[in-house]
Amino acid sequence: NVIFSPRANLRFNPTQNINLRLSYSSGFRAPQAFDEDMHIENVGGTVAMIERAKNLKEEKSQSFSASADIYHRFGAFQTNFLIEGFYTKLTDVFVLGEPYNRGDGVLVKLRSNGPGAKVVGVTLEGKLAYLSLLQVQAGLTLQRSRYDEPHKWHDDVPAKRTIFRTPNVYGYFTATYIPIKPLSIALSGTYTCLLYTSDAA
């Protein structure tokens, strides 16, 4: 099938040091079993086959974002701050059903289309550079991911709107110090909050 996925961007610079941007994009994921599904099952010590439902359709997305990118210099220091808000609407979301034994000892999970979903959040990023000696960069994303209708991923837990294995908070940090060339000292790290498994939505 031919799928039309338009994209559009609009940028406005009210001053030389401020960039404002509006973006729209659409996309899709083809109906298939993904490597990450098998990886998740193997981590749990169990291998389950992923089968596609006969009427499985592609998962589609429409995304909107607005951002402000600000630059400023304080003497020998250069700074940059970015704030971006985003909203994504998903339709025909891929979901995996409860595993069942197909009769030959092999566990099978059925991939089907679930309810729609929404992801909304904000990203903050900052950069600081001092001459050519030091550069520091950090970012933080706060988001909320929810199904439009409660979804039950296991018979032992109640149906909930929370999308499983999606973080609400994640971020990163990098720093590079160059005291003398060619010596470079770097430090970096990432943060991801605990992923939802069984708490209330």
Where does each model-flagged region fall?
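Flexible, solvent-exposed coil segments and beta strand-coil junctions
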Residues: N1, M38-I50, E98-L107, P150-D156, ...
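Signature of Gram-negative outer-membrane beta-barrel scaffolds
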Residues: N1-T15, A30, E41, H151-P158
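Outer-membrane beta-barrel strand-turn architecture
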Residues: F4, F12-Q16, K60, I70-G75, ...
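Hydrophobic, lipid-facing positions within transmembrane beta-strands of outer-membrane proteins
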Residues: F4-L10, L20, R52, Q62-A66, ...
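Membrane-spanning beta-strand positions in outer-membrane beta-barrel proteins
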Residues: N9, N13, N19-S23, Q78-N80, ...
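Gram-negative outer-membrane beta-barrel transporters
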Residues: N80-L90, F94, V106-L195
